[in-house]
Amino acid sequence: MTHPPFLYGTAWKDERTAPLTRLAVEAGFRGIDTANQRRHYFEQGVGDALEGLYREGSVTREDLFLQTKFTYAGGQDHRLPYDPHADFPTQVRQSFASSLEHLRTDYVDAYVLHGPSVGRGLSEADFAVWKAMEALCREQKARVIGVSNVNLGQLRLLVEAAEIPPRYVQNRCFAANYWDREVRALCSERGIVYQGFSLLTANAQVLGGPEMVALARRYRKTIAQLVFRFAQQVGMLPLTGTTDINHMREDLASSTFDLTDDEVRLIESVGAS
């Protein structure tokens, strides 16, 4: 399936993951982002929620866009979804099989490398993991593949080396660097969809400024709705992890109005010094 206009992020919800995932789907979200990283996610909780919704007939698997991730051992706690002594292709296979079991599915719509193993450049491990993910994609167990927490140089290296290029890039998005403009530009050039997370929490200090407040009043929208609409209008696929049902509904309503080109430029530069 093609991706929906919004993704619901399930990080840092622990035992509330299942009820909040259910709430999000009932509110109208059709895209769910998770990871097989028990340290920050409870992937099985997502599956528990979906199993109940499927059983009730509220949605079908085909209605949903499910995205999960492979996370290196350095980003995990002791609850690893694979043998840390195995080679990287085996770790990917084991983690992926565990994800399918957690999510009660035989495929995922997007499988994402949670982040490179090094801060600069890409390692042999990264290339080995990517090849394993490409194999899952060829088998159609992962419809597409992507990468998260990546800088411009790393993304360039990956797209040049990959046989199957990333369909998605998911990054924390800071207004201070024009909402990751350089990475977004490369994504646009290469036909990659940019997913932005922490759009609100990473930018709280600048989003309460007078320009944003005035714009919110003009449209009678919340600051969050302005940010998410801006994101959509610049070609971004935004994530929200709100736990509030009213905020869920407001976030989904972000696509009901359009900002002018000047207003888009204003928001794009709101955090730049």
Question: What label would you give each PLM region?
Answer:
Residues 1-68, 128, 132, 202:
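N-terminal binding-site loop/beta-alpha segment at the start of enzyme catalytic domains
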Residues 115-273:
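Beta/alpha (TIM)-barrel catalytic core signal, keyed to glycine-rich beta->alpha loops juxtaposed to Asp/Glu
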Residues 3-16, 78-90, 118-124:
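Active-site mouth loops of central-metabolism enzymes
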Residues 23-26, 47-65, 100-106, 137, ...:
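Acidic (Asp/Glu)-rich catalytic clusters
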Residues 13-25, 85-103, 153-156, 178-179:
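Short, acidic/polar
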Residues 57, 61-89, 114:
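Structural motif corresponding to the early beta-alpha repeats
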Residues 29, 105-108, 142, 166:
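A structural motif
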Residues 100-121:
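Active-site groove signature of glycoside hydrolases
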